[in-house]
């Protein structure tokens, strides 16, 4: 009955129209329901700039943390990464494919403030507000050592690049400590006046470099067991330190909204600050915003409270990238060891991994 009530339209001749190939390609990747269509490879190539990494997509979102994410580091082999923060958990992720969270390391009873792999990637070190530093086997995920001795929050840790496995730590108790993971207690302690927020070794691991709320960067000599020299220039707390891969220059991030490069070679001129970068900002949240070098030293990156990822050209000091996307303070940005990829950790509980040219 329904068929009979339909009015017939005018009889029009059907004329086939040959569509150009580029129209077919564009049509395959656009319009409603495009996701269900079998787009040809040509359509994907036309979607954006050429790809420059092995990531599944130019930007990958890693979500799984239940609180602010304070730190993130790529494994030295580049295939996995670790992240940690306020939820006291360390999450391990695959870099390629779907970026699965393949393991969760539990053991800290306070927020995890900083993470570092050792040089060969066999161990992962984590500093926590539970006053301890944990040493993890990165293959099995087991905690193999717990370093206890600080009397307040441990804000920073850094493993020696070579030699016996030493690690230095900095704490709110105002001390910088040196540990040999084969021993139970710290093997050296340096007393600073104020809270220590960031530490690293020099290239030969015979000096510890520290920064904190006294605005100064201090270099402690392990052989002579004393303060060797102090680098002044920042006008507010130093929240992040990073040594360049060849060991000649130190990067610092501070609450005076500057990122600085310092010459830490022996017998360098007295004025060791060689470059100042601006753009990133700190705010009332007072998060410990870190900083990092690209593997070849041509770029630097730093955390920022304005929700942007900042990447600078080291030579020209120009901002190469100011990347949006996060909804909270960016606490750390790290470079991939082999590919043009960066990862950012944010107070919005997320990590973004993306490729840069």
From Swiss-Prot:
The keyword Metal-binding does not apply. GO terms for cellular component: catalytic step 2 spliceosome; cytosol; nuclear speck; nucleoplasm; nucleus; sno(s)RNA-containing ribonucleoprotein complex; U2-type catalytic step 2 spliceosome; U4/U6 x U5 tri-snRNP complex. Transmembrane segments: none annotated. It is found in: Nucleus. Keywords: Isopeptide bond, Methylation, mRNA processing, mRNA splicing, Nucleus, Repeat, Spliceosome, Ubl conjugation, WD repeat. GO terms for molecular function: RNA binding. It comes from the Eukaryota. Its main location: nucleus. Component of the pre-catalytic and catalytic spliceosome complexes. Component of the postcatalytic spliceosome P complex. Part of the U5 snRNP complex. Interacts with PRPF8. Component of the U4/U6-U5 tri-snRNP complex composed of the U4, U6 and U5 snRNAs and at least PRPF3, PRPF4, PRPF6, PRPF8, PRPF31, SNRNP200, TXNL4A, WDR57, SNRNP40, DDX23, CD2BP2, PPIH, SNU13, EFTUD2, SART1 and USP39. Component of the minor spliceosome, which splices U12-type introns. Required for pre-mRNA splicing as component of the activated spliceosome. Component of the U5 small nuclear ribonucleoprotein (snRNP) complex and the U4/U6-U5 tri-snRNP complex, building blocks of the spliceosome. As a component of the minor spliceosome, involved in the splicing of U12-type introns in pre-mRNAs. This is U5 small nuclear ribonucleoprotein 40 kDa protein. It comes from Homo sapiens.
């Amino acid at each position: 009955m329904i068929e009979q009530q339909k009015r017939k339209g005018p009889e029009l001749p059907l004329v086939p129209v040959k569509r150009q190939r580029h129209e077919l390609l564009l049509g395959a990747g656009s319009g409603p329901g495009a996701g269900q269509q079998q787009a040809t490879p040509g359509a994907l190539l036309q979607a954006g700039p050429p790809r420059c990494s092995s990531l599944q997509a130019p930007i990958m979102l890693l979500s799984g943390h239940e609180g602010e994410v304070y730190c993130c580091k790529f494994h030295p082999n580049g295939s996995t990464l670790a992240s940690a923060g306020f939820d006291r958990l360390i999450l391990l992720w695959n870099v390629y494919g779907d970026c699965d969270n393949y393991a969760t390391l539990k053991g800290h009873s306070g927020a995890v403030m900083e993470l570092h792999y050792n040089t060969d990637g066999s161990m992962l070190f984590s500093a926590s507000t539970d006053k301890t530093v944990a040493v993890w086997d990165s293959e099995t995920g087991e905690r193999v050592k717990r370093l206890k001795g600080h009397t307040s929050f441990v804000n920073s840790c850094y493993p020696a690049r070579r030699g016996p496995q030493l690690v230095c730590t900095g704490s709110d108790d105002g001390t910088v400590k040196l540990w040999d993971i084969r021993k139970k207690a710290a093997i050296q302690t340096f007393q600073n006046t104020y809270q220590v927020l960031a530490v690293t070794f020099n290239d030969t691991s015979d000096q510890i470099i520290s920064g904190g709320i006294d605005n100064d960067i201090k270099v402690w000599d392990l052989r002579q067991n004393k303060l060797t020299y102090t680098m002044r220039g920042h006008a507010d707390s130093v929240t992040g330190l990073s040594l360049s891969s060849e060991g000649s220059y130190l990067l610092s991030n501070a609450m005076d909204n500057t990122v600085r490069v310092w010459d830490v070679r022996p017998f360098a001129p007295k004025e060791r600050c060689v470059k100042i970068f601006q753009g990133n900002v700190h705010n009332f949240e007072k998060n410990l915003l870190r900083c990092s070098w690209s593997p070849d030293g041509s770029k630097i990156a730093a955390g920022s409270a304005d929700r942007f990822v900042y990447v600078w050209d080291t030579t020209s000091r120009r901002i190469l990238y100011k990347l949006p996307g996060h909804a909270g303070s960016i606490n750390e940005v790290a470079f991939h060891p082999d590919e043009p990829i960066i990862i950012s950790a944010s107070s919005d509980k997320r990590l973004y991994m993306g490729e840069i040219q």
